[in-house]
Amino acid sequence: MVKGVIFDFNGTLFFDNDKHVKAWGAISRLLRNKDITDEELHKHFNGVPNQKIIQYMKNNQATKEDIEYYSKLKEKYYRQFCKEDQASFHLVEGSYDYFKQLKDQKISFTIASASIKENIDFFVESFQLGKWMKVDDIIYDNGTYQNKIAMFKDAALKLNVNIKDCLIIEDSKSGIENAYQAGCRQIIVVNSANNKKEYEKMPGVIKVINDFKELL
């Protein structure tokens, strides 16, 4: 029985991958004078905290100041690109109805995101997330988390629910693997990357959806 739900955000509740790719591309050109390859994107960028991405691009030579500066700059680019594309600046279809359904069932839920605080604040304000969940319970990349596994575990603690009783909703291969390694055995995947057959074979995955209307 599901007692708590943990949502990834980017690519799960909000389809924004193109904006992240565009923003990281700008940073990559600054740091390396080259674009990001598709292989790099899947292996080193998707679902990975900013500090690890910047270390990767700086060959593990990044200082604390480098990480802070380029992380904030990347997210500034990202927010700018989101605002410029108003047509797609909304939550995935069915999201608010699913939030309501969870509320009605008295199932607590939160977000565990690799985004930094400035982005979380941006999402909370833009999508009125405070109407649905405790904003203080949202887990984000504050620089202390080693990986998404630690984020998921902390999110379960915030909900006061054993992670084995949590449903985690993810969209990336690395996110699914991290959810499973964190101890979750009920994982739903939002198929924003159009990889359904691969996701269905992964440990812990119980369902692959295109949007949240499929869970109503």
Indicate where each model-derived feature is located:
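N-terminal helical cap/lid subdomain that shapes the substrate entry/recognition surface
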Residues: 2-93
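Short beta->alpha linker loops
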Residues: 19, 45-48, 90-94, 115, ...
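Alpha-helical elements of Rossmann-like donor-binding domains used by nucleotide-donor carbohydrate transfer enzymes
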Residues: 22-26, 52-56, 73, 97, ...
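Short phosphate-binding/catalytic loops that engage adenosine nucleotides
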Residues: 62, 107, 184-185
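Substrate-recognition element of Asp-dependent hydrolases with the DxDx(T/V) motif
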Residues: 95-125, 179
